[in-house]
């Protein structure tokens, strides 16, 4: 079995590359729309409220995608569903470039969200079931590092490519991830654990069985705790990247440019967090590592809000506090390996995909809650 290997094989590398690139373009496709709002508004005559509807709908569809493709992956296998999710969000993104109305744009952004929601769970589950357990955290974190790179790529395409070629061309060329599936279609093995479970069960299980199992017995409590953990952690993440720039500008008097520079410090810390979390969690355990990095993020946010007047005179303290916030977001590297280890093979993909993407769907309300508080 692949997970019993003492060293990485070419098959491991192909799995990691496809899952990492799939997650990079997953985040890229989800964020890209935000950089194209002005161009789209000008041509399709959309109001701000209509853009909010499109953004909220696509985010909500990620929850549906996480549940749907999670169930399908538990029934039909990790490999084909991972490939289908990448094809789904690639198709949705390309077709956005041909949208002529709010209705068509809403539909294709929904398709994009559906594929985006399914990719994360399938990719992490395939890695968890094929990589050596003692290095599972490290390689799960490596896959997660695609997220900030996806955001950066979306920013580059939105600010450099779009002014020259237009928003439609940006959407169309963003369908290139589909080529990943074509390139790696035959080189990606199926999960040994999934195939073993399928043989022991005498064939495929009933399609809705994994989802139904999440609401029974001890699994129900574990699934609920996983969902709550994901919701709280994701709320802290969106707090940092959605509310915090405005806080620096409106409450602390920073210019847009200066606040942007400080946010880049957080992003740099985020890359450090992703790079280190996996190894730390393999060393001291998933829960201990999560607690450590969550405390770092909490301390950083407390310094930047409750104790701003104390640290503001010192550039070094500001730099350190923002770096702590960024490093603390390394907790995201924990969810794939940790959740994969909490659930049995028969319903692993359903549980992992549902926990993260239902939490992501709930984030539609987070900006409203933050504003109210």
What are the residue ranges of the model-derived segments?
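Cytoplasmic helix-loop-helix junction between adjacent transmembrane helices
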Residues: 108-145
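Extracellular/periplasmic helix-loop-helix junction of adjacent transmembrane segments
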Residues: 34-64
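Helix-breaking motifs and short loop linkers at transmembrane-helix boundaries and internal kinks
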Residues: 45, 77, 98-104, 132, ...
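Helix-loop-helix hairpin linking two adjacent transmembrane segments in secondary transporters
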Residues: 143-186
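C-terminal ends and interior cores of transmembrane alpha-helices
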Residues: 87-100, 296-311
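Extracytoplasmic gate region of multi-pass secondary transporters
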Residues: 34, 219-271, 367
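Conserved MFS/SLC helix-loop-helix module at the cytosolic interface between two early adjacent transmembrane helices
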Residues: 64-102
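Central cavity-lining transmembrane alpha-helices of secondary-active solute carriers
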Residues: 56-69, 264-276
């Amino acid at each position: 079995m692949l997970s019993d290997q003492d060293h990485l094989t070419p098959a491991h590398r192909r799995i990691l590359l496809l899952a990492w690139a799939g997650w990079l373009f997953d985040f890229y496709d989800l964020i890209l729309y935000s950089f194209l709002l002005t161009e789209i508004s000008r041509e399709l005559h959309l109001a701000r409220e209509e853009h909010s509807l499109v953004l909220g709908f696509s985010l909500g569809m990620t929850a549906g995608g996480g549940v749907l493709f999670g169930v399908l992956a538990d029934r039909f296998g990790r490999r084909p569903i991972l490939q289908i999710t990448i094809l789904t969000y690639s198709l949705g993104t390309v077709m956005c470039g041909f949208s002529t109305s709010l209705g068509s744009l809403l539909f294709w952004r929904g398709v994009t969200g559906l594929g985006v929601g399914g990719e994360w769970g399938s990719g992490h589950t395939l890695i968890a079931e094929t990589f050596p357990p003692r290095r599972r955290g490290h390689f799960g974190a490596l896959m997660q590092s695609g997220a900030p790179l996806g955001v950066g790529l979306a920013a580059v395409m939105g600010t450099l490519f779009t002014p020259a070629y237009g928003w439609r061309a940006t959407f169309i060329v963003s369908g290139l991830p589909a080529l990943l599936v074509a390139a790696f279609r035959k080189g990606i093995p199926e999960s040994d654990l999934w195939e073993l479970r399928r043989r022991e069960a005498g064939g495929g299980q009933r399609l809705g069985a994994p989802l139904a199992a999440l609401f029974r017995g001890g699994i129900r409590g574990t699934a609920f705790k996983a969902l709550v953990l994901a919701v709280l952690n994701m709320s802290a993440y969106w707090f940092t990247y959605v509310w915090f720039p405005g806080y620096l500008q409106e409450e602390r008097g920073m210019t847009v440019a200066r606040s942007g520079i400080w946010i880049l410090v957080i992003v740099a810390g985020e890359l450090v967090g992703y790079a280190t979390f996996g190894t730390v969690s393999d060393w001291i355990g998933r829960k201990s590592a999560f607690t450590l990095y969550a405390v770092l993020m909490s301390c950083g946010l407390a310094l930047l809000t409750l104790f701003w007047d104390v640290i503001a005179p010192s550039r070094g303290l500001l730099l350190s506090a923002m770096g702590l916030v960024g490093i603390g977001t390394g907790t995201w590297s924990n969810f794939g390996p940790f959740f994969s280890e909490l659930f049995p093979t028969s319903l692993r993909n359903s549980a992992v995909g549902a926990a993260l993407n239902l939490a992501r769907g709930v984030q539609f309300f987070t900006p409203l809650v933050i504003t109210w508080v």
